[in-house]
């Protein structure tokens, strides 16, 4: 009888130890869907950016595309590590929608390419910011929530820059006084704030 009691105690202890570990590696459906969408978005920005570095006419469009390849590549590496820790294998290939966009862009060049690519970048990043804002507020998993919050400043910077370059390719460059140049280059720094030199998107400091 005593032996059975000891065995039962050990079994209960093992269950108590293993259940939390398993739970830590699981995501609810909403968080899992977010991780998958974020991965698809990263792959799309990387692949479309690579096309743009080869086919864009304006230097500003090529520069934007290079930034997308770099930033989304770094973000996707972080996301892939997070996903694996949660038992998820994220996609590393384009989804049907973005594959069709890639095929379309590959058939364009010059000003036509610039307009089509930048229009897509504004649309994609508008959706990305909304998606990440929701997850940063409502994610159930703490790690996923933190990842979404960390990514937001860069995504907001991408959206602001995409809008700026898109305006340039559709309407032409805007000429402004030199004193306003910083605000145009980094329009997401608002009010009494100015861009911090040598920092990534989304970093602002009080203006001196």
Regions found by a protein language model. Give the residues of each.
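His/Met- and acidic-residue-enriched segments that coordinate or traffic transition-metal cofactors
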Residues: 3-9, 16-208
């Amino acid at each position: 009888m005593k032996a059975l009691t000891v065995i039962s105690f050990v079994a209960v202890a093992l269950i108590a130890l293993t259940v939390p570990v398993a739970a830590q590696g699981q995501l609810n459906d909403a968080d899992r869907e977010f991780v998958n969408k974020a991965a698809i978005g990263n792959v799309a920005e990387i692949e479309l950016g690579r096309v743009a570095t080869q086919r864009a006419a304006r230097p500003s469009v090529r520069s934007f595309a290079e930034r997308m390849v770099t930033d989304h590549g770094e973000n996707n590496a972080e996301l892939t590590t997070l996903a694996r820790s949660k038992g998820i294998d994220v996609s590393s290939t384009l989804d049907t929608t973005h594959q069709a966009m890639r095929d379309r862009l590959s058939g364009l060049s010059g000003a036509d390419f610039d307009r089509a690519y930048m229009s897509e970048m504004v649309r994609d990043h508008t959706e990305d910011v909304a998606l990440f804002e929701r997850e940063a507020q409502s994610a159930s998993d703490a790690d996923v929530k933190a990842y979404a919050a960390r990514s937001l400043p860069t995504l907001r910077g991408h959206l602001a820059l995409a809008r700026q370059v898109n305006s340039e390719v559709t309407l032409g460059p805007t000429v402004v006084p030199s004193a306003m140049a910083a605000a145009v280059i980094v329009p997401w720094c608002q009010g009494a704030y100015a861009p911090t030199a040598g920092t990534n998107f989304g970093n602002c400091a009080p203006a001196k």
